[in-house]
């Protein structure tokens, strides 16, 4: 018999982008996946990777590869053209599989790529915890908020551009919105 607690795991936005957007850049905790309760093993920095390399192959497919504390993230094609996401710290992940695909399959070899680059931008993602083999997730790593205000700037982007300039623009926009 297993006891299980149910609580809100995330407040998520999911986008399907062109499958040609395979190059990833971000300012966040990395270079490996990082969650609110596990990010101390990562370092805040600017990282470059690929959608394929963000995938973490667990014994059973599940949500994976998220980057905690992301300030900006870019997805570009081989020519450097793409999209930039900028915001107050958010969790970010780009992958080849939908959440449903990861949830429904029991083994990685059963996974079918979606044909798009699936992007998750989460206001908050609860910690991973160790509930399957240890204590349940600590209260401080759970999403308890009921009223959420989450703004994210999406803008065309090229690798030649400075993502920090776009982040500064986004920060100015949010400061003005907070005055209203």
Spell out what each predicted region is.
Residues 1-180:
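Beta-strand/loop-rich accessory regions of lumenal/periplasmic or secreted enzymes
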């Amino acid at each position: 018999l297993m006891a299980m607690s149910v609580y809100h795991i995330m407040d998520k936005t999911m986008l399907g982008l062109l499958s040609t957007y395979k190059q990833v850049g971000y300012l966040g905790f990395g270079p490996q996946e990082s969650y609110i309760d596990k990010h101390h093993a990562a370092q805040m920095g600017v990282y470059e990777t690929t959608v394929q390399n963000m995938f973490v192959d667990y014994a059973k497919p599940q949500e994976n590869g998220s980057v905690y504390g992301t300030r900006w993230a870019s997805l570009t094609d081989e020519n450097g053209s793409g999209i930039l996401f900028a915001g107050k710290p958010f969790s970010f992940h780009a992958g080849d599989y939908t959440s449903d695909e990861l949830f429904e399959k029991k083994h990685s070899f059963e996974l079918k790529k979606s044909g798009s680059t699936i992007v998750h931008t989460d206001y908050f993602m609860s910690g991973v915890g160790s509930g399957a083999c240890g204590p349940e997730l600590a209260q401080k790593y759970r999403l308890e908020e009921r009223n959420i205000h989450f703004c994210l700037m999406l803008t065309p982007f090229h690798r030649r551009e400075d993502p920090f300039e776009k982040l500064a623009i986004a920060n100015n926009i949010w400061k003005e919105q907070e005055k209203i």
